[in-house]
């Protein structure tokens, strides 16, 4: 949970602060110490995607993406599907590989317009505590496109759930007082 939280926060330009509070003997409690060790183990393998990384110009609520010059990092939660689709950008991707692979074996991928489809190997999530990081080397500039509100050939516009924010909102008009009431309850 904290590993994903770290990736998500860094992908948005933030910093994760953890309060490790020693007990009355000055010792870090075992639960907190274990959490810090797990974070440290993950960072040994995937730290390049966190340290000195900037948020990506591409926003995707389901896929944290960090960025360094010439390289994007896709932070992928463990999933059954071995195919990962990233949309919303046009970049000349040259090579993709898992940061957890010491050999940096190139992953198969295809690119068409603002869509990149990556094929994940069977062992993509082995030893990465549920969050693999794919490095994607690119050349040139990243062009961001947001297909969220683009009409298809029939003129329909679909808003994907991943790009939506739920809000329990109602609007009513009170004739007695001649005013409109808006009641909103965010789902965060």
What positions do the PLM features span?
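Mature catalytic domains of secreted/periplasmic carbohydrate-active enzymes
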Residues: 1-187
């Amino acid at each position: 949970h904290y590993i994903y939280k770290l990736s998500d926060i860094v992908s948005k330009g933030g910093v994760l602060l953890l309060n490790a509070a020693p007990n009355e003997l000055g010792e870090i409690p075992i639960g907190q110490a274990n959490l810090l060790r797990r974070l440290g183990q993950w960072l040994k393998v995937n730290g390049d995607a966190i340290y000195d990384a900037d948020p990506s110009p591409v926003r995707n609520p389901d896929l944290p993406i960090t960025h360094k010059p010439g390289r994007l990092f896709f932070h992928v939660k463990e999933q059954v599907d071995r195919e990962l689709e990233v949309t919303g950008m046009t970049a000349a991707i040259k090579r993709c590989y898992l940061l957890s692979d010491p050999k940096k074996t190139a992953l198969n991928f295809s690119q068409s317009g603002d869509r990149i489809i990556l094929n994940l190997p069977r062992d993509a999530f082995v030893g990465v505590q549920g969050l693999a990081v794919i490095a994607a080397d690119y050349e040139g500039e990243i062009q961001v496109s947001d297909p969220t509100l683009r009409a298809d050939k029939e003129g329909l516009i679909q808003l994907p759930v991943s790009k939506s924010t739920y809000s329990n909102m109602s609007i009513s008009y009170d004739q007695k007082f001649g005013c409109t009431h808006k009641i909103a309850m965010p789902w965060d």
